[in-house]
Amino acid sequence: MAGNRSNDIKVHCSFCGKSQDEVKKIIAGNNVFICNECVALSQEIIKEELAEEVLSDLTEVPKPKELLDILNQYVIGQERAKRALSVAVYNHYKRISFTESRDDDDVDLQKSNILMIGPTGSGKTFLAQTLAKSLNVPFAIADATSLTEAGYVGEDVENILLKLIQAADYNVERAERGIIYVDEIDKIAKKGENVSITRDVSGEGVQQALLKIIEGTVASVPPQGGRKHPNQEMIQIDTKNILFIVGGAFDGIEEIVKQRLGEKIIGFGQNSRKIDDNASYMQEIIAEDIQKFGLIPEFIGRLPVVAALEQLNTEDLIRILTEPRNALVKQYQALLSYDGVELEFEKSALEAIAGRAIERKTGARGLRSIIEETMLDIMFEVPSQEEVTKVRITKEAVEGQSKPILEIA
Protein backbone atom coordinates (compact mmCIF):
# COMPACT_ATOMS: atom_id res chain seq x y z
CA MET A 1 0.00 0.00 0.00
CA ALA A 2 1.43 3.42 -0.92
CA GLY A 3 -0.32 6.72 -0.27
CA ASN A 4 -3.61 4.99 0.68
CA ARG A 5 -5.90 7.39 2.59
CA SER A 6 -8.58 5.48 4.44
CA ASN A 7 -11.54 7.36 5.99
CA ASP A 8 -11.74 4.76 8.74
CA ILE A 9 -8.11 4.46 9.89
CA LYS A 10 -5.51 7.23 10.00
CA VAL A 11 -2.03 5.93 9.24
CA HIS A 12 0.97 7.48 11.02
CA CYS A 13 4.67 7.27 10.15
CA SER A 14 6.34 4.80 12.50
CA PHE A 15 9.46 7.00 12.68
CA CYS A 16 8.34 10.64 13.00
CA GLY A 17 4.71 10.08 14.04
CA LYS A 18 3.22 12.34 11.38
CA SER A 19 -0.18 11.34 10.00
CA GLN A 20 -1.00 10.73 6.37
CA ASP A 21 -2.61 14.18 6.24
CA GLU A 22 0.65 15.91 7.21
CA VAL A 23 2.90 14.35 4.54
CA LYS A 24 2.77 13.72 0.81
CA LYS A 25 3.02 9.94 0.94
CA ILE A 26 3.26 7.07 3.42
CA ILE A 27 4.72 3.70 2.42
CA ALA A 28 3.43 0.62 4.23
CA GLY A 29 5.46 -2.42 5.21
CA ASN A 30 4.82 -5.33 7.56
CA ASN A 31 3.07 -3.42 10.37
CA VAL A 32 5.50 -0.53 9.75
CA PHE A 33 4.91 2.78 7.95
CA ILE A 34 7.40 5.38 6.71
CA CYS A 35 6.66 8.79 5.22
CA ASN A 36 8.38 10.42 2.25
CA GLU A 37 10.12 12.93 4.55
CA CYS A 38 11.77 10.17 6.61
CA VAL A 39 12.83 8.37 3.41
CA ALA A 40 14.54 11.57 2.20
CA LEU A 41 16.18 12.09 5.60
CA SER A 42 17.47 8.49 5.63
CA GLN A 43 19.01 8.92 2.18
CA GLU A 44 20.75 12.12 3.31
CA ILE A 45 22.15 10.42 6.43
CA ILE A 46 23.50 7.49 4.39
CA LYS A 47 25.09 9.89 1.88
CA GLU A 48 26.78 11.87 4.68
CA GLU A 49 28.08 8.69 6.34
CA LEU A 50 29.56 7.47 3.06
CA ALA A 51 31.26 10.84 2.58
CA GLU A 52 32.62 10.67 6.14
CA GLU A 53 33.99 7.17 5.49
CA VAL A 54 35.85 8.47 2.44
CA LEU A 55 37.19 11.45 4.42
CA SER A 56 38.20 9.13 7.28
CA ASP A 57 40.15 6.98 4.84
CA LEU A 58 41.99 10.07 3.59
CA THR A 59 43.20 10.96 7.10
CA GLU A 60 44.99 7.59 7.24
CA VAL A 61 47.11 8.08 4.12
CA PRO A 62 50.60 6.60 4.65
CA LYS A 63 53.45 9.10 5.01
CA PRO A 64 55.90 9.43 2.07
CA LYS A 65 58.44 7.09 3.72
CA GLU A 66 55.72 4.50 4.32
CA LEU A 67 54.56 4.77 0.70
CA LEU A 68 58.16 4.33 -0.44
CA ASP A 69 58.49 1.21 1.73
CA ILE A 70 55.37 -0.22 0.07
CA LEU A 71 56.69 0.56 -3.41
CA ASN A 72 60.04 -1.03 -2.54
CA GLN A 73 58.26 -4.33 -1.82
CA TYR A 74 57.04 -4.54 -5.41
CA VAL A 75 59.11 -2.19 -7.59
CA ILE A 76 62.84 -2.60 -8.19
CA GLY A 77 65.01 0.40 -9.06
CA GLN A 78 63.66 3.82 -10.08
CA GLU A 79 64.57 5.26 -6.67
CA ARG A 80 64.18 8.93 -7.62
CA ALA A 81 60.86 8.32 -9.34
CA LYS A 82 59.51 6.36 -6.35
CA ARG A 83 60.45 9.16 -3.95
CA ALA A 84 58.85 11.80 -6.18
CA LEU A 85 55.65 9.76 -6.52
CA SER A 86 55.46 9.05 -2.78
CA VAL A 87 55.66 12.75 -1.93
CA ALA A 88 53.23 13.79 -4.68
CA VAL A 89 50.58 11.21 -3.77
CA TYR A 90 50.84 11.98 -0.04
CA ASN A 91 50.49 15.72 -0.69
CA HIS A 92 47.52 15.13 -3.00
CA TYR A 93 45.45 13.28 -0.42
CA LYS A 94 46.63 15.56 2.39
CA ARG A 95 45.34 18.47 0.27
CA ILE A 96 41.90 16.85 -0.01
CA SER A 97 41.72 16.21 3.73
CA PHE A 98 42.92 19.76 4.48
CA THR A 99 40.42 21.36 2.10
CA GLU A 100 37.40 19.40 3.31
CA SER A 101 38.18 19.80 7.02
CA ARG A 102 38.63 23.59 6.96
CA ASP A 103 35.97 26.25 6.59
CA ASP A 104 38.20 29.23 5.81
CA ASP A 105 39.58 30.10 2.40
CA ASP A 106 42.95 31.45 3.54
CA VAL A 107 44.96 28.91 1.56
CA ASP A 108 44.02 27.42 -1.79
CA LEU A 109 46.01 24.23 -2.29
CA GLN A 110 46.32 23.39 -5.98
CA LYS A 111 46.21 19.83 -7.30
CA SER A 112 49.54 18.37 -8.42
CA ASN A 113 49.03 15.77 -11.14
CA ILE A 114 51.99 13.65 -12.23
CA LEU A 115 53.84 13.06 -15.50
CA MET A 116 55.98 9.91 -15.73
CA ILE A 117 58.55 9.72 -18.51
CA GLY A 118 60.38 6.48 -19.17
CA PRO A 119 60.97 3.71 -21.72
CA THR A 120 58.62 0.80 -22.32
CA GLY A 121 58.79 -1.76 -19.53
CA SER A 122 60.37 0.59 -16.98
CA GLY A 123 57.43 0.26 -14.57
CA LYS A 124 55.25 3.33 -15.15
CA THR A 125 51.90 1.53 -15.12
CA PHE A 126 52.93 -0.80 -12.31
CA LEU A 127 53.99 2.12 -10.10
CA ALA A 128 50.59 3.77 -10.52
CA GLN A 129 48.75 0.48 -9.88
CA THR A 130 50.78 -0.24 -6.74
CA LEU A 131 50.13 3.22 -5.32
CA ALA A 132 46.37 2.93 -5.88
CA LYS A 133 46.30 -0.55 -4.33
CA SER A 134 48.28 0.56 -1.27
CA LEU A 135 45.87 3.48 -0.73
CA ASN A 136 42.76 1.35 -1.38
CA VAL A 137 41.33 3.90 -3.82
CA PRO A 138 39.59 3.22 -7.16
CA PHE A 139 42.00 2.99 -10.09
CA ALA A 140 41.50 3.14 -13.85
CA ILE A 141 43.87 2.89 -16.81
CA ALA A 142 43.30 4.55 -20.18
CA ASP A 143 45.28 4.56 -23.41
CA ALA A 144 45.67 8.06 -24.84
CA THR A 145 45.91 6.71 -28.39
CA SER A 146 42.29 5.46 -28.24
CA LEU A 147 40.95 8.92 -27.38
CA THR A 148 39.64 11.51 -29.83
CA GLU A 149 38.30 15.00 -29.41
CA ALA A 150 34.54 15.60 -29.52
CA GLY A 151 32.97 15.21 -32.94
CA TYR A 152 35.31 12.49 -34.24
CA VAL A 153 34.94 8.72 -34.32
CA GLY A 154 36.65 7.24 -31.30
CA GLU A 155 36.47 7.24 -27.51
CA ASP A 156 35.46 10.41 -25.64
CA VAL A 157 37.73 11.46 -22.79
CA GLU A 158 34.72 11.22 -20.42
CA ASN A 159 34.84 7.43 -20.87
CA ILE A 160 38.03 7.48 -18.77
CA LEU A 161 35.90 8.73 -15.89
CA LEU A 162 33.36 5.95 -16.49
CA LYS A 163 36.13 3.36 -16.02
CA LEU A 164 36.96 4.94 -12.66
CA ILE A 165 33.29 5.00 -11.62
CA GLN A 166 33.01 1.31 -12.55
CA ALA A 167 36.17 0.55 -10.52
CA ALA A 168 34.42 2.23 -7.56
CA ASP A 169 31.32 0.04 -8.07
CA TYR A 170 29.41 3.15 -9.18
CA ASN A 171 30.08 4.89 -5.85
CA VAL A 172 30.69 8.38 -7.26
CA GLU A 173 31.99 9.76 -3.95
CA ARG A 174 34.76 7.12 -3.90
CA ALA A 175 35.50 7.62 -7.58
CA GLU A 176 36.00 11.34 -6.95
CA ARG A 177 39.02 10.41 -4.77
CA GLY A 178 40.46 7.84 -7.17
CA ILE A 179 43.51 7.66 -9.40
CA ILE A 180 43.49 7.60 -13.21
CA TYR A 181 46.56 6.56 -15.21
CA VAL A 182 46.67 7.68 -18.84
CA ASP A 183 49.32 5.76 -20.78
CA GLU A 184 50.98 6.60 -24.12
CA ILE A 185 50.50 10.32 -23.53
CA ASP A 186 53.49 11.05 -25.76
CA LYS A 187 51.58 9.59 -28.72
CA ILE A 188 49.16 12.55 -28.69
CA ALA A 189 51.91 15.16 -28.89
CA LYS A 190 51.58 17.77 -31.62
CA LYS A 191 53.50 16.89 -34.75
CA GLY A 192 55.59 20.02 -34.41
CA GLU A 193 56.35 22.79 -31.96
CA ASN A 194 54.51 25.41 -34.01
CA VAL A 195 50.73 25.57 -33.68
CA SER A 196 48.98 24.36 -36.81
CA ILE A 197 45.77 25.82 -38.22
CA THR A 198 44.39 22.32 -38.77
CA ARG A 199 44.14 20.23 -35.61
CA ASP A 200 44.99 16.53 -35.63
CA VAL A 201 42.21 14.30 -34.31
CA SER A 202 44.29 12.43 -31.75
CA GLY A 203 46.81 15.17 -30.95
CA GLU A 204 46.36 18.66 -29.62
CA GLY A 205 42.56 18.35 -29.61
CA VAL A 206 42.76 15.41 -27.20
CA GLN A 207 45.18 17.31 -24.99
CA GLN A 208 42.65 20.15 -24.80
CA ALA A 209 39.85 17.70 -23.94
CA LEU A 210 41.96 15.97 -21.27
CA LEU A 211 42.98 19.34 -19.86
CA LYS A 212 39.41 20.11 -18.81
CA ILE A 213 38.98 16.99 -16.68
CA ILE A 214 42.55 17.04 -15.33
CA GLU A 215 42.35 20.59 -14.00
CA GLY A 216 38.99 19.95 -12.33
CA THR A 217 35.44 20.11 -13.65
CA VAL A 218 32.01 18.60 -13.11
CA ALA A 219 31.75 16.16 -16.00
CA SER A 220 28.67 14.41 -17.38
CA VAL A 221 29.40 10.75 -18.03
CA PRO A 222 27.12 8.36 -20.00
CA PRO A 223 26.44 5.37 -17.67
CA GLN A 224 26.92 2.87 -20.50
CA GLY A 225 29.86 4.63 -22.14
CA GLY A 226 30.02 5.64 -25.77
CA ARG A 227 28.90 8.95 -27.22
CA LYS A 228 26.55 11.35 -25.47
CA HIS A 229 22.98 11.62 -26.76
CA PRO A 230 20.23 14.16 -26.09
CA ASN A 231 17.87 13.27 -23.22
CA GLN A 232 20.33 10.60 -22.02
CA GLU A 233 20.65 10.23 -18.25
CA MET A 234 24.15 11.18 -17.09
CA ILE A 235 26.35 10.53 -14.07
CA GLN A 236 27.76 13.77 -12.65
CA ILE A 237 31.31 13.51 -11.29
CA ASP A 238 33.59 16.26 -9.94
CA THR A 239 37.19 15.68 -11.05
CA LYS A 240 38.87 18.30 -8.83
CA ASN A 241 40.12 15.65 -6.36
CA ILE A 242 40.92 12.86 -8.82
CA LEU A 243 44.67 12.31 -9.13
CA PHE A 244 45.76 12.02 -12.76
CA ILE A 245 49.04 10.27 -13.54
CA VAL A 246 50.03 10.34 -17.20
CA GLY A 247 52.94 8.47 -18.69
CA GLY A 248 54.80 7.84 -21.90
CA ALA A 249 58.12 6.74 -23.37
CA PHE A 250 58.82 10.10 -25.06
CA ASP A 251 61.29 8.48 -27.44
CA GLY A 252 63.81 11.07 -28.58
CA ILE A 253 63.25 13.62 -25.83
CA GLU A 254 66.80 13.07 -24.59
CA GLU A 255 67.99 14.59 -27.88
CA ILE A 256 65.96 17.72 -27.10
CA VAL A 257 67.60 17.86 -23.66
CA LYS A 258 71.06 17.37 -25.21
CA GLN A 259 70.41 20.20 -27.64
CA ARG A 260 69.31 22.55 -24.86
CA LEU A 261 72.25 21.68 -22.63
CA GLY A 262 74.60 21.85 -25.61
CA GLU A 263 73.51 25.40 -26.30
CA LYS A 264 74.32 26.24 -22.68
CA ILE A 265 77.76 24.70 -23.06
CA ILE A 266 78.47 26.93 -26.07
CA GLY A 267 77.25 30.09 -24.36
CA PHE A 268 78.12 29.44 -20.73
CA GLY A 269 80.78 26.77 -20.69
CA GLN A 270 82.01 27.52 -17.21
CA ASN A 271 78.56 26.92 -15.69
CA SER A 272 77.82 23.68 -17.52
CA ARG A 273 78.50 20.10 -16.60
CA LYS A 274 79.08 17.10 -18.79
CA ILE A 275 76.41 14.39 -18.87
CA ASP A 276 77.57 10.97 -19.99
CA ASP A 277 74.52 8.91 -20.93
CA ASN A 278 70.88 9.11 -21.95
CA ALA A 279 69.70 7.97 -18.49
CA SER A 280 71.28 11.04 -16.94
CA TYR A 281 69.76 13.26 -19.61
CA MET A 282 66.31 11.96 -18.63
CA GLN A 283 66.82 13.38 -15.14
CA GLU A 284 67.46 16.83 -16.67
CA ILE A 285 64.06 17.13 -18.40
CA ILE A 286 62.23 20.43 -17.85
CA ALA A 287 58.89 21.80 -19.06
CA GLU A 288 60.56 23.49 -22.04
CA ASP A 289 61.76 20.10 -23.35
CA ILE A 290 58.30 18.55 -22.99
CA GLN A 291 56.76 21.47 -24.86
CA LYS A 292 59.27 21.08 -27.69
CA PHE A 293 58.34 17.40 -27.84
CA GLY A 294 54.73 18.39 -28.54
CA LEU A 295 52.65 18.74 -25.38
CA ILE A 296 50.87 22.09 -25.15
CA PRO A 297 51.92 24.52 -22.37
CA GLU A 298 48.49 24.48 -20.67
CA PHE A 299 48.61 20.68 -20.43
CA ILE A 300 52.16 20.67 -19.07
CA GLY A 301 51.14 23.29 -16.51
CA ARG A 302 48.62 20.86 -15.00
CA LEU A 303 51.36 18.22 -14.55
CA PRO A 304 53.79 19.94 -12.18
CA VAL A 305 55.35 16.73 -10.84
CA VAL A 306 57.66 15.08 -13.39
CA ALA A 307 59.15 11.67 -12.55
CA ALA A 308 61.74 10.33 -14.98
CA LEU A 309 62.23 6.56 -15.06
CA GLU A 310 65.42 4.97 -16.34
CA GLN A 311 65.96 2.06 -18.71
CA LEU A 312 66.24 -1.11 -16.64
CA ASN A 313 69.56 -2.94 -16.97
CA THR A 314 70.33 -6.66 -16.62
CA GLU A 315 70.90 -6.45 -12.87
CA ASP A 316 67.58 -4.60 -12.37
CA LEU A 317 65.67 -7.20 -14.38
CA ILE A 318 67.22 -10.09 -12.45
CA ARG A 319 66.18 -8.43 -9.19
CA ILE A 320 62.66 -7.96 -10.59
CA LEU A 321 62.57 -11.67 -11.39
CA THR A 322 63.58 -12.74 -7.90
CA GLU A 323 63.10 -10.11 -5.16
CA PRO A 324 59.60 -8.51 -5.04
CA ARG A 325 56.71 -10.17 -3.21
CA ASN A 326 55.14 -10.90 -6.60
CA ALA A 327 58.40 -11.88 -8.32
CA LEU A 328 57.85 -14.19 -11.30
CA VAL A 329 60.36 -16.78 -10.07
CA LYS A 330 58.55 -16.97 -6.72
CA GLN A 331 55.22 -17.37 -8.51
CA TYR A 332 56.41 -20.30 -10.62
CA GLN A 333 58.12 -21.90 -7.63
CA ALA A 334 54.83 -21.70 -5.75
CA LEU A 335 52.90 -23.22 -8.67
CA LEU A 336 55.24 -26.21 -8.95
CA SER A 337 55.39 -26.65 -5.17
CA TYR A 338 51.69 -27.59 -5.28
CA ASP A 339 52.82 -30.62 -7.29
CA GLY A 340 55.58 -31.36 -4.78
CA VAL A 341 58.30 -30.18 -7.17
CA GLU A 342 61.13 -27.76 -6.38
CA LEU A 343 62.03 -25.19 -9.06
CA GLU A 344 65.47 -23.63 -9.40
CA PHE A 345 66.69 -21.01 -11.89
CA GLU A 346 70.45 -20.96 -12.40
CA LYS A 347 72.02 -17.49 -12.32
CA SER A 348 73.03 -17.82 -15.97
CA ALA A 349 69.39 -18.62 -16.82
CA LEU A 350 68.20 -15.44 -15.10
CA GLU A 351 70.85 -13.47 -16.99
CA ALA A 352 69.65 -15.00 -20.25
CA ILE A 353 66.01 -14.09 -19.51
CA ALA A 354 67.01 -10.51 -18.69
CA GLY A 355 69.17 -10.34 -21.80
CA ARG A 356 66.31 -11.41 -24.02
CA ALA A 357 64.03 -8.75 -22.52
CA ILE A 358 66.65 -6.10 -23.24
CA GLU A 359 67.12 -7.36 -26.81
CA ARG A 360 63.37 -7.20 -27.43
CA LYS A 361 63.24 -3.73 -25.82
CA THR A 362 60.30 -4.81 -23.66
CA GLY A 363 61.90 -4.23 -20.26
CA ALA A 364 60.17 -5.78 -17.24
CA ARG A 365 56.94 -6.10 -19.23
CA GLY A 366 58.46 -8.82 -21.42
CA LEU A 367 59.83 -11.03 -18.64
CA ARG A 368 56.66 -13.07 -18.15
CA SER A 369 56.35 -14.04 -21.82
CA ILE A 370 59.99 -15.20 -21.90
CA ILE A 371 59.51 -17.36 -18.80
CA GLU A 372 56.23 -18.70 -20.21
CA GLU A 373 58.07 -19.82 -23.34
CA THR A 374 60.70 -21.55 -21.22
CA MET A 375 58.29 -23.14 -18.74
CA LEU A 376 55.44 -24.24 -21.04
CA ASP A 377 56.54 -27.86 -21.55
CA ILE A 378 57.56 -28.20 -17.89
CA MET A 379 54.21 -26.93 -16.62
CA PHE A 380 52.47 -29.36 -18.99
CA GLU A 381 54.49 -32.52 -18.32
CA VAL A 382 55.75 -32.39 -14.72
CA PRO A 383 52.37 -32.58 -12.91
CA SER A 384 51.93 -36.05 -14.45
CA GLN A 385 55.46 -37.20 -13.56
CA GLU A 386 55.22 -38.07 -9.88
CA GLU A 387 58.83 -39.24 -9.75
CA VAL A 388 60.16 -35.73 -10.52
CA THR A 389 61.24 -33.83 -7.38
CA LYS A 390 63.15 -30.89 -8.84
CA VAL A 391 63.36 -28.86 -12.05
CA ARG A 392 66.46 -26.83 -12.87
CA ILE A 393 66.28 -24.08 -15.51
CA THR A 394 69.58 -23.47 -17.30
CA LYS A 395 70.79 -20.82 -19.71
CA GLU A 396 70.57 -23.37 -22.53
CA ALA A 397 66.92 -24.07 -21.66
CA VAL A 398 66.08 -20.35 -21.88
CA GLU A 399 67.84 -20.09 -25.23
CA GLY A 400 66.03 -23.18 -26.56
CA GLN A 401 69.19 -25.24 -26.97
CA SER A 402 68.18 -27.93 -24.46
CA LYS A 403 65.41 -28.90 -22.10
CA PRO A 404 65.36 -28.03 -18.37
CA ILE A 405 67.08 -30.57 -16.12
CA LEU A 406 64.73 -32.89 -14.20
CA GLU A 407 65.82 -34.55 -10.96
CA ILE A 408 64.09 -37.81 -10.02
CA ALA A 409 63.64 -39.28 -6.54
Swiss-Prot record:
Entry keywords, A to Z: ATP-binding, Chaperone, Metal-binding, Nucleotide-binding, Zinc
Residue intervals of the ClpX-type ZB domain: 1-54
Domain of life: Bacteria
InterPro entries listed in its UniProt record: AAA+_ATPase, ATP-dep_Clp_protease_ClpX, ATPase_AAA_core, Clp_ATPase_C, Clp_protease_ATP-bd_su_ClpX, ClpX_bact, P-loop_NTPase, Znf_CppX_C4
GO cellular component, one term: HslUV protease complex
GO biological process: cell division; proteolysis involved in protein catabolic process
Protein's UniProt keywords contain Transcription: no
Pfam families in alphabetical order: AAA_2 (PF07724), ClpB_D2-small (PF10431), zf-C4_ClpX (PF06689)
Binding positions for Zn(2+) per the UniProt entry: C13, C16, C35, C38
Gene3D superfamilies: 1.10.8.60, ClpX chaperone, C4-type zinc finger domain, P-loop containing nucleotide triphosphate hydrolases
Positions bound to ATP: P119, T120, G121, S122, G123, K124, T125, F126
Single annotated GO MF: ATP hydrolysis activity
Tagged with keyword Chaperone: yes
Function: ATP-dependent specificity component of the Clp protease. It directs the protease to specific substrates. Can perform chaperone functions in the absence of ClpP.
Entry's family note: Belongs to the ClpX chaperone family.
Name the UniProt record assigns to this protein: ATP-dependent Clp protease ATP-binding subunit ClpX
Species annotation: Streptococcus equi subsp. zooepidemicus (strain MGCS10565)
Organism placement in taxonomy: Bacteria, Bacillati, Bacillota, Bacilli, Lactobacillales
Name of the coding gene: clpX
